[in-house]
Curated annotation (Swiss-Prot):
An individual GO BP term: positive regulation of glycogen biosynthetic process
Comp. bias (Polar residues): 13-22
Top-level taxonomic group: Eukaryota
PTM sites of type Phosphoserine: 81
The organism of origin for this protein: Mus musculus
A single GO molecular function term of this UniProt record: glycogen binding
Name assigned to this protein: Protein phosphatase 1 regulatory subunit 3G
Signals that turn on the gene: Up-regulated during fasting and down-regulated after feeding.
InterPro entries: CBM21_dom, CBM21_dom_sf, PP1_regulatory_subunit_3
Gene that encodes it: Ppp1r3g
Function of the molecule: Glycogen-targeting subunit for protein phosphatase 1 (PP1). Involved in the regulation of hepatic glycogenesis in a manner coupled to the fasting-feeding cycle and distinct from other glycogen-targeting subunits.
Length: 347
């Protein structure tokens, strides 16, 4: 075909399109592509016609790039129409229902009315004409009045077999011997305290003398005692040193002096040998002291063990410190000793 005839045919087609009736919606929806060829004018050509026409090598190479670009644009446009997060959609739906005030499925009333009906209220007794407090006065001379219905119900229930068994157990416990009379290990002193005159003589000689010792009953483990010291001016203190490890270790416990118990020491009789002239006069004043020793519970023998073979002993001595010096009462060098003995007699 002649090239000039082809150009004339294209121009007539374009003029007939412009001067004819308006195109239908289907024809308008067909996309047009601006096609530019060498030696021709720029004329928009429908996409359907381009598909039928053979493509040049340059256009064939550029066509895949255009398709990729169009696919990318479609994916971008489609991403804006994706559904939102389900949680956000549920929250929006609940918010819309609350704003619209939809009625409940059962009563047909809004959901907010139920909360208003079920709202708790507080009423006081005085607002209803009642008293805020109820006072009941009881008298010691007044006997409590038990309702007859309660008494009849109490008498209608006889003792059960379990109650009788418990009663028998209580009677058996009541007939048991006194537990204090059961032989058990008790602390006993293994020394003899001096008599009154011998204690006064010891007090004059060493200025301190132990006069009384008492051991507590099991299961307590305590030793208490008292004695006297010759009072002197200035600071003074009394302590008890004791051990239960045969003096491998020992403890010093301070004793308590009683300054209100000051009493003069009786003078020596003239017939006593070795007495001095000043001893015939009234003796110096004395003060009484008290102490308490706490023993560990592991020292006491267990039940069934021989207390004699246990071999545990408590040794102690009394120390008196004053401005004149330090004085000891250690039972004439033998120490005061306590041991566990199985016995039923109290000390």
């Amino acid at each position: 075909m002649d090239p000039s005839g082809e150009q004339l045919h294209r121009s007539e087609a374009s003029s007939s399109t412009s001067s004819g009736d308006p195109q239908s919606a289907e024809e308008l929806s067909v996309p047009e592509v601006l096609c530019v060829e060498s030696g021709t004018s720029e004329t928009p050509i429908p996409d359907a016609q381009l598909q039928d026409r053979p493509l040049s090598p340059q256009k064939g190479a550029a066509l895949p790039e255009q398709e990729e670009l169009q696919e990318y644009r479609r994916s971008r446009a489609r991403s804006f129409s994706l559904p939102a997060d389900p949680i956000l959609q549920a929250a929006k739906l609940l918010q819309q229902r609350q704003q619209a005030g939809q009625p409940s499925s059962e009563g047909g009333a809004p959901a907010g009315d139920c909360c208003s009906k079920c709202k708790k209220r507080v009423q006081f007794a005085d607002s209803l004409g009642l008293s805020l407090a109820s006072v009941k006065h009881f008298s010691e001379a007044e006997e409590p009045q038990v309702p007859p219905a309660v008494l009849s119900r109490l008498h209608s229930f006889p003792l059960r077999a379990e109650d009788l068994q418990q009663l028998g157990g209580l009677l058996a416990v009541a007939t048991m011997p006194d537990p204090l009379l059961v032989p058990c290990a008790r602390l006993r002193p293994h020394f003899q305290l001096p008599e009154l005159r011998a204690a006064e003589e010891r007090l004059r000689r060493q200025r301190v003398c132990l006069e009384r010792v008492q051991c507590s009953q099991p299961p307590r483990a305590e030793v208490t005692g008292s004695g006297r010291v010759i009072s002197c001016p200035g600071p003074r203190a009394v302590a008890v040193r004791y051990t239960f490890t045969e003096w491998r270790t020992f403890l010093d416990v301070p004793a308590e002096l009683d300054p209100e118990s000051v009493e003069p020491l009786p003078p020596l009789q003239s017939g006593d040998s070795g007495s001095k002239a000043e001893d015939s006069e009234e003796g110096p004043g004395t003060e009484r002291f008290h102490f308490s020793l706490c023993l560990p519970p592991g020292l006491q023998p267990k039940e069934g063990e021989d207390a004699g073979a246990w071999g545990v002993a408590i040794h102690f001595a009394v120390c008196y410190r004053c401005e004149q010096g330090e004085y000891w009462d250690n039972n004439e060098g033998a120490n005061y000793t306590l041991r566990y003995v199985c016995s039923t007699d109290p000390l």
